[in-house]
Structures are given as C-alpha cells and as structure tokens.
Amino acid sequence: MGLEHTFYPAEDRFEPLLEHSEPVNFVPKENAKSYVRQGFASPHQSLMDNLVDSTESTKRSENFVSHIPLTPSHSGQSEKLMSTRTSHSPYISPTMSYTNHSPANLTRNSSFNHQHYSTTLRSPPSMRGRGIDVNSSHYPHISRPRTSSDSQKMYTRAPVDYYYIQENPYFNNIDQDSISDKSLPSTNQSLHHSEEDTESDNDFSESIHPEFDIDVFYKVSNILYDESDLQDPEKRERLEWHSMLSSVLKGDVMQTEKRRLRLTEPDGHSGTYISEVWLGLQAWLHGRLNADQAEVIRKSREGVEPVLREVIDFQIQDEETTKPPLEQVTEILEKVEQCKQFYISSREMEENVPLSASKEFNYKLNALISWSNVMESIQVETLVLQKWVGNDEFDLTMRTPQFNYDGVENTSSFVERIFRQSGLQRTFEQRTLTTLNRIIHQAKQTISENAQAFEEMKLPTYEDKLLPLVRFPIKLLEEALRLRLAYAKKIKGPNFLIVDSMLDDFKIALSVAVRIKREYIKIASPSPGWSLPTNVDEDYDNVLLDSLKFYFKLLTLKLSSGNKNLYFKEIDFLENEWAFLNEHIYWINGGDIHMAGQFSYLSNSLLLNVHRYVESHLNGPTERTAASLTNWYSTLLKNTQIRFRKILRFSETLNSRFENASDFVISEGHLPDLVNRLSTTGHFLAYTANLERDGVFVIADHTLSENPEALKALLFSKDISNLETIQQNCSYVLILCPVHPIVWKGRIEKVDVPDFSVDLKTNRVRIIASNKREHLQAAKSVFQSISGDLVTLAVECRSSITRVYKEFIRLSKLCMRISSTVVDCVSAVREACSGVNCHDLIYHVFSFAAEFGQRILRFLSFDSYWQTKLKRKITSLAVEWISFICDECDLMDRKTFRWGVGALEFLMLMIRGNNILLIDDAMFLKIREKVGKSMAFLLTHFDVLGAKSKVAAKLQRESTEVSSSPRLTSFGDVEEEALSIQLLQKETMLRIDELEIERNNTLLERLAIGHVLDDSVFRNRDFIKLASSFSNITIRWQQGHFVRSGMFGDVYTGVNMETGDLLAVKEIKLQDSRTFRSTVDQIHNEMTVLERLNHPNVVTYYGVEVHREKVYIFMEFCQGGSLADLLAHGRIEDENVLKVYVVQLLEGLAYIHSQHILHRDIKPANILLDHRGMIKYSDFGSALYVSPPTDPEVRYEDIQPELQHLAGTPMYMAPEIILGTKKGDFGAMDIWSLGCVILEMMTGSTPWSEMDNEWAIMYHVAAMHTPSIPQNEKISSLARDFIEQCFERDPEQRPRAVDLLTHPWITDFRKKTIITMPPATITKKTSLSHTITEEKTAQLLAGRHDDSKAETDSLAASYKEESALPVASNVGLRQPNELRIDSINLPPAIVTPDTINYSVD
C-alpha cells in the first residue's frame, strides 16, 4: 500500500524559501505535531490530484524541507527557480500541506502514469464539477489555513507558466526512463491522452492503491539553493541530510529490492486469494459457510465427467417415445452449463477434468450449440413472419379485415398492403427480410461445418422448417408481380406520365425479382448436409417472363407516344434499357430470346418512323421561298441523318450480340457421306425427343459430351460460364435438316432441351457457336475441314434465334426503302425548288443522298441481291447529279467547278470494277455524254499561269451592285370566322357542363354511405371528424417514389391501380399521442377547405383514406414542381411572361376568397405548377373557412376569432397579422402575401432578403415598412403601381383580388395577348365566365370599366355567388378544369418562362 510521508515546517520561524514566490499557507503547528507523531498521511488520493492551480495569495514556510537533489545551483536563473516550484509541486497538497511519497512503498504502474501531468494545474477529479472549493482541504487533518506575518516575496510568473517551463524536461525524463527499464510497463502510450482520458476509470491499475514512481523526478532540474545556502550551518545540515536520504533511496540495494517485489506479485493478487474470494461469493450466494460450500463444490465436481461423456455419446432418441429433438439438446446443454458453474474459469475446469479440453468433446458441444441456436432463430423468425403476413400458412393472397373508420368493411391481402405502404424495393430492405436472409445463410453455414457431427448425433436437419422461410421472398415477389400485372393490364390508353411511372415500377420489380432469384440459387447450391431444390418454381419463372413481356410493351408505348422530348433521345433511351436488361436477362428463363426479338423489333420500328418522317416532309413547306425551302429541307436532312445513324449503330451492336451461326447447303446426294464423317470424328447425336419429330437433328462436337449446359447455352444464345474453354476447344453444335432419313452410327446422348422453332430449309446444315466472331470462324474452319466439298456456304453469318434473324431481314428491307426514298427525295426537292434559286440546297441534297446510299451499301454487303439493286439506283443518282451541274448550274461559277469535281469522283466510285459491266447500254451512253460535257466546262476553269485569277479579281472589285425585291404581306378579314369559332366553343362548353353536373350527382349518390362510429371510445371521437367526411374513400392504389417531406407528413407519387391515374399522396402518421388531436384537427381543417374548392388554379383534392396509425390524402400530382423551384434559377425577366402567371394567381385567389376561404400562407413554395405550367395553389393547412355573417353589417373578424391568430410565414406576412389590428376587407392579408410573391418573381430574391432573421423581418413589417420595389428602369410604371397597391399599409384601403383583375397592368395585357389554356371540364356553376355578364366582359376588355367602388363590388358579388360542387374523389384522377378568363385563354405549357409563346397584335 502506498504511503505519504508528510514533512512539516519547524516550530515558529517562517521565511520565504524562493524569491518572487507566491505566499503559500501551511498547516498549523498544532496539527503538524500530531501528524508528525503518526508519520503518515492519508493514502487515498493520487499524488497528481494534489496539483492545484490557485490564484489566491498563500505563504510559504521558511523551514520547509524540500525534496531536492544536492547539486550546485545556478545563480540568477529565475526560470529554473520557478520551474522548481512546479516540478516539486507534486509534494504540495491542495490544502497547503507538503507531502513526499516514499519510493520504497510506491510501485511504478502504467495505469498511474504521467498523463496527469499533461494538463495545467487543477483540482483533484473527485472535487471537480461538484461545487467543492479546491482551496479547502480534502484531508481530514488539515482544516484551517495559516498565514505568515513575516516578509514575503511574490513570483514574477504565473503558476501555469512555471508548469510549462518544466514540462519538456519532465516528459523527456519519462521517455528515457521507459527506454532504460524495459522490464517495467511502458508509459509512452499514455503521453497523448487527453484531459478527459485522465478522469476515466481506465487510468488506474487493478490494484487497490496504485503506487507512484518517484524516479521520474530525479533528473528534473529543480535546484532551489545557491552557494550562500551552504554557508549557513543550519541550511547546510538540512541539505546534507537530504543528500544522504537521496543516496540511500537511490542506491543499488533499494532498487534491487523494488524490482524483486514487483516480480514476485506482478498482478497484486495470488491465485489463492482469487479462489478464496470466489468461494466466499459462492458461499454467500447459497447461504452457506465457506467450508460447507467447498464440500458441496467438491462433491458436485465428481459428477462433471459423466456429463461430458454424455455429451460425447449423445444421440437423438425417437420422438415418439421421448422428447422432441430441440428439448433433448436443450437439456444436455443445460447440464453442461451447470457443470461449468462449479469452476472459476474454463482453464481450471480443463485442469481438473482433462476431458473438457479434448477435441472430441468440444467438437460435439459446439455442434450442439450451433444446432440449438439455429433452430431457435428459425422458430423466432417463423413467428415474426407469420405475424407480419397475418396467417400461419404464409398465404399472401388471404384477405384479412382491416380497421376502417368509416365503418365500411375493408379487406386487403398482404401484398396489397405492401404496395400501399412501402413498395417492393423498400420492403426487401426492411429489417425483417434482411434478418431472414442472415438467418438462412447462418443455417447453411452451420450445417456445412457440422454435417458430420449432426449425422453422428442423429440431429434432424431443419430444412423442412427452413424451406418455407427460404421460399417466402420468392412467393412474396411472385404474388406482387402477378398482382401488379393484373392491375396494369386494366389500364386503357395510358398517357406518357402513367407509362413512365409503370416503367419505373416494373424496372424496380424486375431488378428485385432477379436479385431474389440469384440469392435463392446461391442459398440452394449444394453443400455438405444441405439439400434444397436448386431451382425456383416454374410459376415464378413464368410470372417473371410475363413481367418482362409487359415491360417491353411499356417500352413500345413510350417510344410510340410521340413525345417530343424523346424525339432525338430514342436510341439513347433504348441503349440504357439494353444495358439494364443485359445485366438481369441471364436469370430470366426464355428472357434472352424474347429480349433479342423485342429490341430488334423496337429498332426497326424507330427506323420505320424515320422513313415515315422523310416521306411526310418531302412535299416541303407551303411557302415557296428560297429561305423557307432551305430551312425546311436542311432540317429534314439533318434530323434524318442523326436519327438514322444512331438507329443503325444500335442495330449493328444488337446483331453482333446474337450473330452466332452460319448456314451451309449440303451437296446433292452427299448427305450419307456427311453423316458418316461426323459420326467417325467423335460427334454425338443429342436426342431431344422433340425436334426429331419435325425432321431436325442436333449433332454436337465431342467436347460438349461432358458439358450439356454449354450445349443448351449455344443452342439458345445464352451467356456461357466457361466461355474461354468452349472457345479454346472450338466447340460447336450442328443442326441438320435432311431431305431423306439418316442412319447415325455414332454415340447418342439424351439432352433435356425445351422445344424451339428452327427456321432451317431442308438439305441444309447450320453451325452454331458463341457470339464471338473469332469462335464462329474457327468452328467453321473445323467443320469445313471435316465436311470438305460436301457442303457449300449459303449464309456467312446470322443469328440462330429465328425472330432476331427475321427482324434483321426486315431491317435490311427498311434500310433499302429508306435509301430509295432518300434518293427519290432529290427529284422531289428539285421539283419543289423549280423557279427558285436554290442550287446550294439541291447540291447538298445530292451530296446527302450519295453519302446515305454508300452507308446502306456497306450495311447490305451480306445480301448481293439488295446490294446490286441499290447500286443501280445510286449510279442513276450520280448521273443525275452530273446532269444537274452541267444543265442547271452556272458553269462560270467557281463553286460549280468544285461541285462538278465531287460529282465526277462519286460517279467514278460507283462504276469501278465490274460495276460498270452491270450498266445497260442506254445508261452507259448517258454517262459518257454527261461526263464529256462536265469535263469540257471543267477545262474552262483551269487557270494557266494565273491569268484567270487576275481577271476575276478585277471583276470582283468592279461589281458592287446589290439587288433586292420587296415583300408584300396581305391580311384577310377574319372577324366572321372568329365569331363562328366563338359560338361553337360556347355550345361545346354548355354540353360539357351538363355532362359534368350529371356525373357529379351520380358520384355524390355513390358516396352517401357509411356507418356511425362508436363515440364512447375516446380515440374514435377524434376520428369522427375524418371518417364522417364524404371524401373518405377506399381505392386500390400503389405507392410510388418519394417527392418531398413537409411539416405534417411525407408526399409520394401514387398510381390508381383501377384507372392508372397518377396521384400525389400525402402520408400523415398519427402515432404520437401528444400531437394526435392537433394533427387530426389540422387534417380535418385542410379537408374542409379543399372539399369546397374546384378550380383550375387550385390543386385538385380527391379524398382521404383513414387508417389506425396514418391518414392518406389524395391530391392532384403537379409534375412541374413549385414556383420556388422555378425562381431558384433566377427572376422572370420578361414582364409579359410575368403577367401570365399573375393573371392565374389573381384568378385563383379571387375564386378562393369567393368561397369564403382565407389561404393565410401564400408563398412560392405553396404554389405548384402542373406538367403544362398551370399555376396551382396548394398547402391549405393554414387556411381558414369563414362562414359568411347573416347580418351584412357584421364584419368577418367579429364572428371569427381565429382571424386574430398569427399564421403564415414572416417574410410574406401582412402588418395587421403581426400587430393583431384591424383586418380590413376579407382576404386583405392574402393580397399582401401575393404582392410579396409577385415581387419575388420580379427580383428573383425573397422579400426582406437583406434581413438576417425572422424577428428582424417581423419588426420591420410591424413598423409599417414595405419590401424594396425595383426601380422604374427594371419594371414598368403600371407594374410598380400594381405592387404598391398590394403593399397598401392600411388593410381597409388594400384592393381585393377582383379589384386587381381590373388594374390597367392586367387589362392592357389581356387586350393585347391571346393566351390559350388546355381544354377540360368543369360544372357551369364553378365557371368564372358565366358570373360576368357579356356587357361587363366587353367593358373590361375594352378598358372602359368604371373604377368606382360599385363596379368592383359588383364584380366581387359575382364571385361570391358561386358555390363549388364537392369533389368526386373515388373514381381516380379528374381532368384539369377549364377556366374562361373573360374570353382569354391561358397557356398550354408553361414549363419555364422562356417556353411561353404569346403573340401581341
């Protein structure tokens, strides 16, 4: 045990020990005397806990006996003196007691190390943070400080400074000491510990009282005396006494004894001591004496070895006569565990019972433990899945009733709940299925590692219990795909948005399905003791193939939708889909053949579209001017070239992927010879039992006899796992279709190959290799060396897949048709340009057709018939090209010379070789004539000695005249035609309104059902608000991808599974009981508001679906994002574009106010845009419906206290809302917010953007300040006046939305601009056009409106007379409503401001 020797001052004399010292208080004399007699101080505090950074003035004794090595001093070194003060400070207690720890009783231990010194002087850890005064004693024998009345001297440095002075030598000393004494624990690893580390329990050794190593201070420079001290007899006596003490403690004898004591008990406790402690604890736990407990343990240990023998000889007994296997294993394991309790550790047990250390025992014991753990995990996971699915049979299609708050029975299967709540991808990422996968792999590993032990102990395999778990993901995905296919096939004529959504869904489903199949095959792979079905069910493969087929159907719909955004990206889209499916198609049985055929079909369809595009545009524009013709045909040629090159490149890549065969014709009468040669060269006949009935035989190379899977892969063009080996052996398969029966004398092997169609003519043989061209060429060489002259090559390279080859032939024909059309387009262009000087255009058409024909010729190199036919057509084109140059162009123009040279070179290329022999006489004579004429005019351009160049330069300087022809424009009278169109539109709208009224009435009748909830249940009382709503619906829908997260819930896309319409689904969770009621009130308030609104500029609300823990709100899906997203790219610079948005904002707000609703949170983030750019008000969570007062003299705020509540976003908030003052006319607060939104659209930055927090914004708004409005040079004066009216400080004077609709800034725009809006349907009652009389409309359009209050009141009254019908919400997505704004139509697609087309008279 470490002891502290406390040295106290002498009797009464106190003198300063150091110069510049801070006064230090010492222990009083009376306390010193008592503890000098004892000679010891309290050992319970570590030495470094005595270091205190004290800022109070204390005194130091003159007679203090310092622990200092006797070395000469260095006069004048004040820093060393100061260092001494801190270096010897470990012997200063925090209560002014100076202590010294004897090295004889202190052991150096790495746990108690110098990390305590690495920080500044501080209080002990036991006192830190507990409100204890560090300047008061924490030792019981020191209670009162005492100060000296003698003279004192102060330090010139702070205590921390002196600590840092001695820090470096201190650490160096520690490092040197650690290196010099290798036998002791190293303390270097503690050097870098932080201050926080020193306060942890890990800093101390396992011994009760850690010892302190005093040696680390011997080398610290801490000389506190000088030569004058040696002259003083008393001081010299003390110094000599200390030198003697130091010599004794540092001597060899003392150091040797210290090391010997350390080595005898390195851990501080002996084994006997630990055993006694353990025995005492066991006796105390069992309520016995130590002797009695020792006897009990001794007798119990006698029965340990039989238990171990029982483990070694353990075997499962018959279940009919004994317990189940799991109980038997659990019982024997409990016995072993009981035996282990009789020993302190496994080492003691192995020493006492050597059998427990034997390999046989541990092998059997580990096997039993592994088997038991896996069985228990399987049972737990089975219960979890049964609870999740809802039944014990894992029946995923069983419909179970769910809680429904409207009283209508709502049953759904487990798969439908998966679609509704999380979707496939997130379902397979959940913890339940990941845990299941881990348990299955763990079970397989356990069986593989302990298969022999399980067999010896007759432990039953748990495959029968594990198989339902292994097949669960397969069954889940199979039912999910089947259900998704059933719903998808119900969709009739889906638009491109629905097609995109379904493509994403099926892409995720296919990738997940393939991943699950791969995992199953990996799990089911053979292993010792592991035997599961290696293949998935056939039904799973069938539904996976059906999903792939429907996926291609969706691809076809997308490519044929006519979407302009996809026009030049069709091939890029196909290439991405090809890359995706190429990764997964190997795992879909039959999918590779279907994929090859479908992609070939799609590429041909795109090529056919190019051909139709060329044919439809050959006639040219209606306006026959040089500029219009050049622009028209240049665009046509450019688009055709880009699309055709991409399609042809993709088709070539596709064909090269599946080109793996060649066809040979068998010479007449040599069939038996060929068969004999094949049978004698090691080939074998692969008997399929299917193809032989059709007269088709499969003969394979001898290298495939031991690899039937490779044979199947070659037949079906699949990827081969050992492709390199197949290529090295030049393996191949022959398909023989003889005219007469054959006699096979070689080997016959039965091969299980499914039936497939073979498009092979009789008396032919087809060789099939891999899709590597080198492999096919090598296989052909081997086959031809065997067959010799018995066969003749018919088709050099083709695909063995029938549909791919047919599509390739179709592609060749399409290329031929397009080439012919392009060549013929030259004559069409020349005819369209007759009478117009378009020689440049015609020349470029000739050049394009020539280059196009050359590309097709290279592609058709395999077919001599089509190639010859096309060559003749292109040769005729070359002759026409020369004729055009010689007959129609200016022969004196140098440009004509360049054109003529190019045409002659192209003609020479086309008639080279034997091609000139294929030309008939008439064509050859024409060629000679035209070539001679062209050569004649070419000679006129030859410049001999540069004479013509000089003449041409002179003529160029003299010609300066430029001619131009005026353009005349005439306009016809269209007033009569416009009137007829207007009458037709009115009649159409009346009919549509009648149909809408009838439809809405029918839907209202269908929704008039339900059941009253039991309001005695407390939780149901809050749900009555939601469940009693007529918009509470039940539809089959699927959750899509995540859109964004809001304050009250997350928004996802959704698909109505019955109609295929897209929805926006807001999911609000009701799990927090603290906010349950407020959330329900919030949902009910938003539903109440949305049910009253039905307008094209308000997001459409479809209904709500109430569940026990969540609520789904179905709304219109706005694909264009929010106005805030649009403004993130910058402000709207064009004021006319800005007005298009402002008109929609005003119309929507006017309608909202006419329905007695305040929005109260208008901001860009709450204003959405649909896929056509229409403005939509959304997020009515803060909105408020205000019932109109019965007394016209009563104001809204008098009957609706909620109007006084603070609601909205501070930067868009009106002053009266912050101040709580008068509110003005109904909706005045929304007008201020609308002005802030319009200002943000003008500037691109939020209002009050210069403020750094919301409190500053509220302060400025409350002070009646207005946001900064742009200068007049940025906006027009009318726009500035409009904004200033929105920011009217007095809410009584602030205009309403209907007032702003009559503002000149709006009416002038309406008179000049014709804006169109997409057609849709709405009841006549909600149409804004019928509320304004024709006379009033004419006045507003003509600008002859009266600005008086009566006029605007009349217009507002017309809005207030409207009452929107409730939204029919159980039949899917409704079409956007049509809004007639004073006979002005709104834009069809406002995606971005620069895409808005408007025309100004």
UniProtKB/Swiss-Prot annotation:
Which reactions appear under catalytic activity for this entry?
Answer: L-seryl-[protein] + ATP = O-phospho-L-seryl-[protein] + ADP + H(+); L-threonyl-[protein] + ATP = O-phospho-L-threonyl-[protein] + ADP + H(+)
Q: Does the keyword 4Fe-4S apply?
A: no
Keyword list (alphabetical) reads:
ATP-binding, Kinase, Nucleotide-binding, Serine/threonine-protein kinase, Transferase
* Residue numbers annotated as active site: D1161 (proton acceptor)
CDD domains xrefs: STKc_MEKK4
Extract the Pfam families matched here: Pkinase
Q: Name one GO molecular function term.
A: MAP kinase kinase kinase kinase activity
Where are the residues of the annotated region Disordered? 67-99, 176-205
- In its keyword annotation, does this UniProt entry include ATP-binding? yes
**Domain Protein kinase positions:** 1037-1306
GO CC annotation: cytoplasm; cytosol; Mcs4 RR-MAPKKK complex
Instruction: List the SUPFAM superfamilies hit by this protein, alphabetically.
Output: Protein kinase-like (PK-like) (SSF56112)
Compositionally biased region (Polar residues): 72-99, 176-191
Could you say which EC number(s) this protein's record lists?
A: 2.7.11.25
Record PANTHER family: MAP KINASE KINASE KINASE SSK2-RELATED-RELATED, MITOGEN-ACTIVATED PROTEIN KINASE KINASE KINASE 4
Family from the record: Belongs to the protein kinase superfamily. STE Ser/Thr protein kinase family. MAP kinase kinase kinase subfamily.
* Official protein name in the record: MAP kinase kinase kinase wis4
Q: Which organism is this protein's natural source? A: Schizosaccharomyces pombe (strain 972 / ATCC 24843) (Fission yeast)
